[in-house]
Amino acid sequence: MKIQSNVIKIIIVISLLIGVGALYLLLSLRTPEKPLAGQVNIYEDNVKIGGDFELIDQNGEIFNSDKLKGNLSLIYFGFTSCPDICPTSLNKMTEIVEILNKHKIDILPVFITIDPKRDTPIALKEYLKHFHPKFIGLTGNEQQIKDVTDKFKVFYARVHGDDDDPNYMLDHSSFTYLIDANGKYLKHFYLDSSPKEMMEFLRNE
């Protein structure tokens, strides 16, 4: 009887472990983790990416999406206080522009802020001095930025600091969008995409 009792206890424990494991798996599948910078995915099937927008450039002038037409464009969403991801991506864009210019191909690099509170036209102008001189920096009010980020499926959220903290930080997706000469979305490149990968795609276009 003692052996039978021990067997029953073992069976109960195993059943409980299986139940807990199944519950954990179910919750994991139903509750996605908060995306980290550069890890958000864009599902292109039946999803329109891009669209018309009107913002303010680093010179304080109105800049709308029609001004992208006529040449290829690369668009990146970030903020000037970004410590590493944004500078890395903008440096890659600078490299791409320089390579294409050597082959007599014009491409316009565009940086759209997700932090309009701090990224004024003056702040953008100063920041973009560190990258290719062709860079266009765009800002606007919070609603304008929300509208354009929604159209490009951009994730961003405050992760450190509150409204009173001037040094708050943002987490955001890190894609570089390739726009064709008609102002239409062609493809997006990930944070870890190399300039070589981008060039290979452009050569095939």
Swiss-Prot record:
SUPFAM superfamilies: Thioredoxin-like (SSF52833). Cu cation binds at C82, C86, H172. One of its GO terms (molecular function) is metal ion binding. InterPro entries: SCO1/SenC, Thioredoxin-like_sf. It comes from the Bacteria. Keywords: Copper, Metal-binding. Belongs to the SCO1/2 family. This is SCO2-like protein RC0895. The lineage of its organism: Bacteria, Pseudomonadati, Pseudomonadota, Alphaproteobacteria, Rickettsiales.
